[in-house]
Amino acid sequence: MRLGILGGTFNPIHNAHLRIAEEARDLYQLDRVVFIPAATPPHKPLVGELSFASRLEMVRLAVADNPGFMVSDMEGVRGGRSYSIDTLRELKARYPDDDLFFIVGADSFNDISTWREYEAIFELCNVISVQRPGSTITSLAEALPVAIAGEFCYDPAAKRLNHCSGHAVYALDGVLLDISSSHIRLSVQGGRSIRYLLPDAVEHYIKEQRLYVDAR
């Protein structure tokens, strides 16, 4: 099975997250995409002190009608800081015969050298970097940490960077929805509409639970 992995704080999950996952699933012929909310993200503090349980429930509501999507609470169950390398190793242990595709944003990919054991990520799985409009696989190659750049070679026919482990780095283009979780939180706080920015079920949950009313 080809399994996509999309992690994040999902505070809250919105339509751009879902569109990224769907485009990756379609373009790279992924059998499933698993959404994994971070319990305690190591690189940025959670805004609004929203519980893991609330963020997990919003993700469940968001993906409920798509059989190609699934949700995992593994980072909440594991506890502690949510390091991607730990999650990827756990997934590889659970699904040793599956091909893993780790989906990350361009900003995250550009900062990947700051991640714990980032070198091992490319040995465990393929990486799909969601690029800004106009970016190319060449700019993706330039973002590789110098320490490991020599482990990759450019495959122009496939438009990917092949890693010596047999995995690859792909550039996903064309996801143009300019939606951010911070904008949604501020809109809720200011009493503005968030309709069409996220699934209806998630919007209703936010209103029912009075989430983000005082968050920034």
UniProtKB/Swiss-Prot annotation:
This protein's UniProt keywords: ATP-binding, NAD, Nucleotide-binding, Nucleotidyltransferase, Pyridine nucleotide biosynthesis, Transferase
Keyword check for Nucleotidyltransferase: yes
EC number: 2.7.7.18
Catalytic activity: nicotinate beta-D-ribonucleotide + ATP + H(+) = deamido-NAD(+) + diphosphate
Keyword Transferase: yes
Disulfide bonds: none
Pfam family, one: CTP_transf_like
BP GO terms, sorted: NAD biosynthetic process
Annotated pathway: Cofactor biosynthesis; NAD(+) biosynthesis; deamido-NAD(+) from nicotinate D-ribonucleotide: step 1/1
InterPro entries xref list: Cyt_trans-like, NadD/NMNAT, Rossmann-like_a/b/a_fold
Protein function: Catalyzes the reversible adenylation of nicotinate mononucleotide (NaMN) to nicotinic acid adenine dinucleotide (NaAD).
UniProt protein name: Probable nicotinate-nucleotide adenylyltransferase
Taxonomic path: Bacteria, Pseudomonadati, Thermodesulfobacteriota, Desulfuromonadia, Geobacterales
Name of the coding gene: nadD
